């Protein structure tokens, strides 16, 4: 997927992100204030996500950890800060600490994230997310 900036070139915050009027199925990630459009996943990608979600769900049943497939916002900072500049949506997110789970997604580092890679992923895109 080519990187696409949303709206005009500027730095965005979580507050901005929450106020965007997005069309159905439109998704973005904020990484250090830069907004990147996310393309719709293909059928193979979705099949892998579904299979892994089912396996993790079964494994985690009865444990404090919960599995969340995308779209599920992950903010790496725990504090309630509307000025956060990074919000990502990993393909799968596991969160064990109940205090990190909220109606708006995960606040703080999750216990596990899974990204399904595809041939369309660029090296720059993968490095950008890995460095988080």
Which residue ranges define each predicted feature?
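Gly/Pro/Ser/Thr-rich low-complexity, intrinsically disordered segments predominantly at protein N-termini
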Residues: 1-132
